[in-house]
Curated annotation (Swiss-Prot):
The gene is Fibcd1. It comes from Mus musculus. This is Fibrinogen C domain-containing protein 1. It is a single-pass type II membrane protein. It holds the Pfam family Fibrinogen_C. One of its GO terms (molecular function) is metal ion binding.
Amino acid sequence: MVHERWKTVGSASQLEDRPRDKPQRASCSYVLCTVLLSLAVLLAVAVTGVVLFLNHTHTPGTAPPPIVSTGTAGANSALVTVERADSSHLSLLIDPRCPDLTDSFARLEGIQASILRALSEHQAQPRLDGAPELLDALADQLPRLLTRASELQAECAGLRKGHSLLGQGLSTLQSEQGRLIQLLSESQGHMAHLVNSVSDVLEALQRERGLGRPRVKADLQRAPSRGARPRGCANGSRPRDCLDVLLSGQQDDGVYSIFPTHYPAGFQVYCDMRTDGGGWTVFQRREDGSVNFFRGWEAYREGFGKLTGEHWLGLKRIHALTTQAAYELHVDLEDFDNGTAYAHYGSFGVGLFSVDPEEDGYPLTVADYSGTAGDSLLKHSGMRFTTKDRDSDHSENNCAAFYRGAWWYRNCHTSNLNGQYLRGAHASYADGVEWSSWTGWQYSLKFSEMKIRPVREDR
């Protein structure tokens, strides 16, 4: 219909313009064609916009998009044709008498190709039927995402701070490591110096030991009541020690009553009648750990335990025995592999020169070592007896409390026969039944027995 109207208008214009001159008609035709071409371009752009708008709306995806095409430059052909979804066509025509607009058509075809390409790319993208709901969900998620982003930023700042602190800590540790290495180096030097000093002290002690034996013997001989005794009991049925019991005819080991010179009330003791000729008065025994030896001063002064088993005779009684004559000491030892050793001391006494032996702490006098166990007692000679509640040693600490025993500690010990019964090798240091010269400071012996006997005239 548009085409027919265009023809009618064209015919009328030809009839009316016949009297006019040709230049005027050509000018009008040129203007009219230009206007129509502009309208066609605007219409094509408008149609393209409508198509894009329709593609963005939530319409069912089954209807095909409109098809836009252009015609050729021949007569009676449409400039632009739009085929709608309902198969109807919209055509824009142009008068064939218009000037040659081949370049314009080429530009329009380029525009058409761009529009079609844009439509094709747009249609290739998936349609978002739930776009509003998605936008609402995104709007709901956005605050949480922002909050989480803030939290992550804070965590990142914390991690940076922690990294900085770790760096500072590593620097500090490196400094401490250097300082410790320096201290260890200095300690090694001090240790070497200490070892040399200890070696010098040991050599001096050995020299003093060699020089001190005659002096100790002289002191023991000067003790008024410690002369050599004749055989047999001084007053018939009252033996002063186990040697008197042996000389009275008793040959069996066991418990007997004795009556020392300075202890007329008497007390019972266990007598060893077999070792080295017999006649030994036992004052200490460890054999099974059944008796607690970690006790105080009063218990060690009075004695405790069972005479036929583990026991300590008592400092008061040992003093009474060793002040009535010159005594020798024999120490029997056994480990948990049934190995045995002994230590013998030719001179032994407790509180020999004390007016008040308890006040003086029952000091030890011992000399003249021989045997197979090695000497671990001479270092303690001259020391007072120390218990956990009465400290008489030369250490800053209480050796009895520290090494869980009671002994004539110096600083602190080379033997600890009244220590804990730890049954062989142990991780702790020097707190077992120890005789260091034989088994070291980390082995607790299975058996120990300390016994005394008067020095006989025939020796």
